[in-house]
C-alpha cells in the first residue's frame, strides 16, 4: 500500500530545512519497503531553497502564500486561507493525502483540523494522544493539549478513544487494557469535583479495567495502558517528562547505556495524534529536532498504513455503552 503523507515545513521553532533533512532520512530508511509519496507545504522562499536539493526530485512541493506562526492568534491563523497548514489540511480533507504532519501552532492545528476534517461520530471532542515509554512497553496519554478545560463526559470520551486506539493496534482482538485517571493522589477522594465525577463514571463504565487514580510517577511504571487527563494537566506532564529525559541525557551523556536511552527516548514515538478526527493528523512538538521529526514522520507512515483512524472509528462505536 502506497502511503501519501503531507508535511508542513513551516511554523515550528526550528529551521524548515531541519524538516527537509528528516524527510530525506525517512526516505533512505524506507528503501525496499512499500512506497511513500511525500507532499510538503512551504512558502515560496523555502521552496526556492529546496529546488537545488536532490531530494526535490522525490518529493512534491506545494507553495503556500503564508504560514501560521507560534505567535498567531486563532483568528489570525484561520484568516490565513493559503497557509502551509491550511493547504495541507485541505489536501487531506479532499482525499489527496492519507495523513498530515505539522510541528506548528498546536491550537491553530487543532482548530483548523476540526473545521476541515469530519469528526468520528459520537466523539464529543478531539484530544491530543501521545505514546510514552514505560517499564512494560508503552502507554498512551490523552489529552495532552488540545483542550485546556473539559467536563467529565468529555474525559470519558477520551478514555474510549484511548482504548479504541490501543485495540486498533493490537494483534489480539481480545487483549485486555487498563485505564487510569491522572490525579494528585491515588485515593478516590482526591482531585477537583470534576475529577471525582470522572472517576465514578470511568469506574461504572469500564469496571475492573479502570484502576482508579494514578499519580505522574505511575505512568512510567506501566501500571496502566491508557492515561486519561485534561489538556492542561496532560501538556504540563508531557513537557516535564520530555524536559527530564533531555536533562538526564545531557547530564549522563555516554554513561547512559544505549539500551536505556532507546527504552525511554520519547523521540522514537510518533508525535501527538489528534484523535477523534476521521483522518490522520499528527502534531510534532514545535521544538522537535531531527530525531523527533524522523520518529514523528515515520510513525505517521505506520499509522496511515494501518488505517488507524478508520479502525479507531470502528472500535469507538464498540466502546460506547
Swiss-Prot record:
Pathway: Lipid metabolism; phospholipid metabolism. Its EC number is 2.3.1.274. It catalyses: a fatty acyl-[ACP] + phosphate = an acyl phosphate + holo-[ACP]. PANTHER family: FATTY ACID/PHOSPHOLIPID SYNTHESIS PROTEIN PLSX (PTHR30100), PHOSPHATE ACYLTRANSFERASE (PTHR30100:SF1). Keywords: Cytoplasm, Lipid biosynthesis, Lipid metabolism, Phospholipid biosynthesis, Phospholipid metabolism, Transferase. One of its GO terms (cellular component) is cytoplasm. Its main location: cytoplasm. Coiled coil: none annotated. One of its GO terms (biological process) is phospholipid biosynthetic process. It is an enzyme of class 2 (transferase). This is Phosphate acyltransferase. One of its GO terms (molecular function) is phosphate:acyl-[acyl carrier protein] acyltransferase activity. InterPro entries: FA_synthesis (IPR003664), Phospholipid_synth_PlsX-like (IPR012281). Homodimer. Probably interacts with PlsY. Pfam families: FA_synthesis. The gene is plsX. It is found in: Cytoplasm.
Amino acid at each position: 500500500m502506497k502511503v501519501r503523507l503531507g508535511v508542513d515545513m513551516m511554523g515550528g521553532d526550528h529551521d524548515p530545512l531541519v524538516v527537509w533533512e528528516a524527510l530525506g532520512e525517512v526516505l533512505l530508511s524506507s528503501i525496499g519497503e512499500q512506497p511513500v509519496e511525500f507532499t510538503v507545504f512551504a512558502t515560496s522562499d523555502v521552496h526556492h531553497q529546496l529546488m537545488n536539493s536532490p531530494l526535490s526530485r522525490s518529493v512534491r512541493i506545494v507553495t503556500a502564500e503564508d504560514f501560521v506562526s507560534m505567535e498567531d492568534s486563532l483568528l489570525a491563523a484561520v484568516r490565513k486561507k493559503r497557509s502551509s497548514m491550511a493547504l495541507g489540511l485541505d489536501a487531506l480533507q479532499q482525499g489527496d493525502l492519507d495523513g498530515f504532519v505539522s510541528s506548528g501552532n498546536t491550537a491553530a492545528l487543532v482548530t483548523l483540523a476540526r473545521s476541515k476534517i469530519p469528526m468520528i461520530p459520537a466523539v464529543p471532542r478531539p484530544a491530543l494522544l501521545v505514546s510514552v515509554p514505560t517499564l512494560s512497553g508503552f502507554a498512551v496519554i490523552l489529552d495532552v493539549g488540545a483542550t485546556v478545560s473539559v467536563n467529565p463526559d468529555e474525559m470519558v470520551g477520551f478514555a474510549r478513544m484511548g482504548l479504541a486506539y490501543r485495540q486498533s493496534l493490537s494483534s489480539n482482538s481480545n487483549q485486555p487494557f487498563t485505564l487510569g485517571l491522572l490525579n494528585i493522589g491515588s485515593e478516590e477522594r482526591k482531585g477537583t469535583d470534576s475529577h471525582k465525577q470522572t472517576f465514578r463514571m470511568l469506574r461504572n463504565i469500564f469496571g475492573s479495567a479502570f484502576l482508579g487514580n494514578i499519580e505522574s510517577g505511575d505512568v512510567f511504571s506501566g501500571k496502566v495502558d491508557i492515561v486519561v487527563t485534561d489538556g492542561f494537566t496532560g501538556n504540563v506532564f508531557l513537557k516535564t517528562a520530555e524536559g527530564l529525559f533531555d536533562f538526564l541525557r545531557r547530564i549522563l551523556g555516554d554513561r547512559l547505556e544505549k539500551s536505556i536511552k532507546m527504552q525511554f527516548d520519547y523521540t522514537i514515538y510518533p508525535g501527538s495524534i489528534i484523535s477523534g478526527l476521521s483522518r490522520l493528523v499528527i502534531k510534532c512538538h514545535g521544538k522537535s529536532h531531527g530525531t523527533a521529526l524522523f520518529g514523528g514522520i515515520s510513525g505517521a507512515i505506520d499509522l496511515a498504513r494501518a488505517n488507524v483512524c478508520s479502525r479507531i472509528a470502528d472500535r469507538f462505536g464498540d466502546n460506547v455503552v
